[in-house]
């Protein structure tokens, strides 16, 4: 990668030219094969990169600049269109290689099922892993219309993998009654409607533990993020999500990886959603990479 490409829109702004010298690797997962309503999130990673050239490199939230963190944008994993299982296998293999290389993986989706193979790779690396999950939806189904590979299932899958007591979901305002009942029955940490205040209460409990953070853009109210596949009224503001990212940055937890998913720019011709997403990525880079 040439230095001038760092401002081209082909990569996330200010991307470092060297994989070897970088602490963080940004990678895209352009998959929306299993969505239940509106496809289009496969175009999210590219558009987040394109609009990132409009970002300031300085964060007034964290008093840091992007040049202080070395991150490499590796582009998108070349996922086979329509083949969900092969796509998930490729994501798990890629993230495992990043972890073996000592990199902080920062993934861009794509539908939320792409987080499932990442969870598996992270759990192998960190046996005491905890998950912070911000979303409008529970994502606790075992299957959707009989299909276990669905974007409505990744949090149920990771609960089964690492134990529901190690999964913390915030901002939840939609799901089947059975999903909410299951979460309560098994002792999962599910916080409805809000993110920031319950997150502040949880963070001290996670100090010293490796934590993976997954953010579904639809945790935001559609007024703040219309470009997503499954809109859900009654969400949080972009400011609350920014404040939550900063709260994590100012805590003593050890964030070991993250993803931001379900940006579907085809439904947002003003680019409001990818512009917000690119700002969230900036704050993750500056706040979570210690």
Curated annotation (Swiss-Prot):
PROSITE patterns hit by this protein: ARGINASE_1 (PS01053), ARGINASE_2 (PS51409)
Pathway assignment: Amine and polyamine biosynthesis; putrescine biosynthesis via agmatine pathway; putrescine from agmatine: step 1/1
Keywords tagged on the record: Hydrolase, Manganese, Metal-binding, Polyamine biosynthesis, Putrescine biosynthesis, Spermidine biosynthesis
Domain of life: Bacteria
Signal peptide: none
InterPro entries: Agmatinase-rel, Ureohydrolase, Ureohydrolase_dom_sf, Ureohydrolase_Mn_BS
Function field: Catalyzes the formation of putrescine from agmatine.
Protein's name according to its UniProt entry: Agmatinase
Organism of origin: Bacillus anthracis
Top-level taxonomy: Bacteria, Bacillati, Bacillota, Bacilli, Bacillales
């Amino acid at each position: 990668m040439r230095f001038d490409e760092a401002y081209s829109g082909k990569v996330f702004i200010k991307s470092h030219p060297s994989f070897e010298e970088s602490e963080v690797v940004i990678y895209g997962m352009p998959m929306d094969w299993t969505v239940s309503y509106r496809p289009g999130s496969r175009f999210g990673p590219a558009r987040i990169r394109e609009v990132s050239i409009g970002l300031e490199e300085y964060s007034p939230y964290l008093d840091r600049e992007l040049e202080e963190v070395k991150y490499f944008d590796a582009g998108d994993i070349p996922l086979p269109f329509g083949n969900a299982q092969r796509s998930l296998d490729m994501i798990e293999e890629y993230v495992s290689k990043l972890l073996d290389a000592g990199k902080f993986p920062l993934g861009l989706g794509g539908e939320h099922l792409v987080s499932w193979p990442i969870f598996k790779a992270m759990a192998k690396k960190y046996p005491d892993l905890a998950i912070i999950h911000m979303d409008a939806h529970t994502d606790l189904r075992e299957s959707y219309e009989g299909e276990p590979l669905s974007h409505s299932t990744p949090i149920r899958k990771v609960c089964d993998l690492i134990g529901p007591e190690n999964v913390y979901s915030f901002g939840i305002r939609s799901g089947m009654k059975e999903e909410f009942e299951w979460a309560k029955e098994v002792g999962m940490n599910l916080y409805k409607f809000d993110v920031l205040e319950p997150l502040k209460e949880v963070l001290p409990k996670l100090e010293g533990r490796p934590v993976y953070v997954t953010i579904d853009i639809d945790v935001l109210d559609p007024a703040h993020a219309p470009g997503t596949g499954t809109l859900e009224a009654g969400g949080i503001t972009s400011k609350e999500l920014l404040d939550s990212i900063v709260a994590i940055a100012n805590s003593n937890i050890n964030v070991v990886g993250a993803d931001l998913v379900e940006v579907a720019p085809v439904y947002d011709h003003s680019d409001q959603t990818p512009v917000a997403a690119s700002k969230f990525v900036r704050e993750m880079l500056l706040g979570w990479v210690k």
